[in-house]
Each structure stands twice: as C-alpha cells, then as structure tokens.
Regions:
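Terminal amphipathic helices with adjacent charged low-complexity linkers/tails
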Residues: 40-98
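Non-catalytic terminal/interface segments that mediate subunit docking, oligomerization
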Residues: 89-142
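Short capping/connector residues at structural and topological boundaries
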Residues: 6-8, 13-17, 22, 27, ...
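Short acidic (Asp/Glu) and glycine-rich catalytic loops that position anionic groups and cofactors
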Residues: 4-6, 26-33, 72-80, 131-134
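Phenylalanine-focused residue identity feature
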Residues: 2, 26-28, 37, 55, ...
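Conserved catalytic cores of soluble enzyme domains
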Residues: 1-61
C-alpha cells in the first residue's frame, strides 16, 4: 500500500526502492504502524484472527469469553525476583514480567514490530481477558 510507486520515487529522490520496501507488509507493521499483525500464510492469518477474537466480546452487551485455566492462582513465580536489575539504568524485558503472571504464561502481542519501546497485547488472568499496555525498557529505555 503506497501512494506512488518505485519509479516515481527514483525519479524524484534518485533512490532505488522496491514495492515491498515502499509499502509492503513488513514496512507497514514495523515503520508506519498501519498494520497490527503480519502473517506469512492465509492459514496463519485465520489462526491469528481467531486468537484475537477469543479475547473480545461478541458485542458491546456481552462480556469477553471466559476461558478456564488450571494454573494455581497462588503460584509463586521466583523468576520475578530477578527480572528487574538492581541498577536502574540497566534494561530488562518487560515480557519477562508479563508472561509468567498470565494464565498458561500466554501473551498475545499486538503490533510486535512497531514502536518496540511499548508492549501491547492481550492475556488472561484467572480465565478473564485483559488488555496490557506497558513500557518496554529493553528498547529506547521504554
């Protein structure tokens, strides 16, 4: 998806770009932020859509679907004791905090290639769907 093609770009800027660089899936999922998901196959696309819809209600009058989980709600996640470094200037991966506390340690990330200093996605806590927005200290200090 682009307004003008590679030939016009070459004429105006003397830069050589192909259609994928100019407006392909990776460009829009990593640079422009137009796309939220990027899939390689139609099957993968349909699976991603199903997964996304599993977190959302069917309409504004319903609750999001409840998914039973067998995780112990009193479980201790020892790894959380060491994720955040003692030095406040050291980076860490926020997903190392998000994933262990979610049901089945599963986090469905939205826009994983765009604005890597922010993490956005869905998960479940005790079977209930939750949306997550967090700074990502591992990139650009969050």
């Amino acid at each position: 998806m682009f307004i003008t093609g590679p030939d016009v770009v070459k004429t105006v800027t003397h830069e050589e770009v192909d259609k994928e660089e100019l407006g392909g899936a990776y460009t829009h999922s990593s640079k422009s932020g137009v796309t939220h998901f990027m899939c390689n196959t139609e099957e993968e696309t349909l699976m991603s859509i199903r997964e996304l819809l599993s977190f959302l209600p069917s309409n504004n009058m319903e609750d999001a679907p409840f998914t039973p989980c067998s995780d112990d709600i009193h479980r201790r996640v020892e790894a959380l004791q060491t994720v955040i470094p003692e030095d406040p200037n050291m980076p860490y991966d926020i997903k190392d905090i998000i994933e262990p506390v979610l049901d089945n340690q599963y986090f469905f990330e939205v826009m994983p290639h765009f604005a890597k200093n922010v993490v956005i996605g869905f998960g479940r806590l005790n079977g209930r769907s939750v949306g997550i927005v967090a700074n990502q200290p591992a990139y650009l200090a969050g």
